[in-house]
């Protein structure tokens, strides 16, 4: 049976890109990249980095809106979507891959607003000191992410914080078991773990298609990276104006992570707390997330490009 990929109709169906290309990372890993929107060099550019077990399809709502008047670049993290898997998994690889995408898609000195969800946000933290990041990033948006203690603070299991919950959570998130077909039970589990209780069936279906399409070996390999994650130093190096978005019902990266980011970021320009929403904020609140991106572009990218 073929693996489900993404929904093909409705607001969460991925739009066709204007151009596709392959970026080659430092270790030779090949990354699938999509470019959406006008080719006009005067329009602002936004770069989207998705999270663990997701793909470019996760950004469908943002791409559809922003591509009307922005150049939008989205790429599949290694092993996800149409980017082949690699033996190298780690925060250095995430940073290398983002640098490769920036080099392949942006002109020298071109500025862009960089947006990361979950592991995509961690990618921005990991790359904060890299030369290409500093050359191109004019502002950043971190959605539903954290910099350390991810497993210890996750609330996927209804248990009190402590060694027991941490140990079981580690085994659950790091499981090598296949997710299987998308059934009503599978949808209910995914909704409970990753989305707010008010998420619509269409939102849940879109996320289920994307997550279930991630190969289990890739899911397991990157879960080990997230388990050991420590990017607190990267947050302190993220000096561009940075906004944070988080759901108050996020079980994977609870609100405490967002508040810690706000307290640590050198140049935080706001925290948006979305009441009752879970981990999949770009899908659960597409208008809010897209609106924050547009605000960052208006406040920073257009000023820089016109200077």
At which residue positions do the language-model features occur?
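Conserved alpha/beta-hydrolase catalytic His-Asp/Glu region
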Residues: 148, 175-236
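Conserved alpha/beta-hydrolase "acid-adjacent" motif
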Residues: 251-257
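Flexible "cap/lid" loop of the alpha/beta hydrolase fold
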Residues: 129-173
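Conserved HGGG/HGGXW glycine-rich cap/lid loop of the alpha/beta-hydrolase fold
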Residues: 29-85, 104
């Amino acid at each position: 049976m073929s693996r489900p990929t993404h929904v093909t109709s409705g607001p969460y169906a991925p739009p066709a890109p204007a151009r596709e290309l392959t970026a080659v990372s430092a270790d030779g890993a090949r990354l699938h990249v999509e470019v959406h929107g006008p080719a006009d060099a005067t329009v602002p550019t936004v770069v989207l980095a998705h999270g663990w077990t997701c793909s470019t399809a996760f950004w469908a709502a943002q791409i559809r809106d922003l591509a009307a008047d922005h150049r939008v670049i989205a790429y599949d993290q290694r092993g996800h979507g149409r980017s082949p898997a690699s033996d190298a998994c780690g925060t250095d690889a995430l940073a290398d891959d983002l640098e490769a995408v920036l080099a392949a898609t942006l002109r020298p000195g071109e500025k862009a607003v960089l947006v990361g969800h979950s592991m995509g946000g961690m990618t921005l933290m990991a790359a904060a000191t890299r030369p290409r990041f500093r050359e191109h990033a004019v502002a950043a948006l971190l959605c539903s992410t954290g910099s350390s203690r991810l497993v210890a603070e996750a609330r996927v299991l209804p248990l009190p914080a402590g060694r027991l919950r941490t140990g079981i959570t580690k085994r659950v998130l790091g499981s090598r078991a296949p997710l299987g077909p998308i059934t009503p039970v599978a949808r209910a589990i995914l909704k409970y773990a990753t989305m707010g209780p008010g998420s619509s069936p269409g939102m849940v279906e879109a996320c289920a298609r994307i997550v279930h399409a991630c190969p289990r070996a890739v899911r397991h390999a990157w879960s080990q990276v997230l388990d050991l994650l420590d990017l607190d130093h990267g947050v302190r190096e993220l000096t561009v104006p940075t906004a944070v978005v988080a759901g108050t019902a996020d079980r994977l990266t609870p609100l405490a992570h967002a508040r810690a980011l706000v307290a640590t970021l050198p140049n935080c320009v706001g925290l948006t707390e979305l009441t009752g929403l879970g981990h999949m904020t770009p899908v659960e609140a597409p208008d809010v997330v897209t609106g924050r991106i547009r605000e960052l572009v208006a406040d920073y990218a257009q000023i820089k490009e016109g200077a």
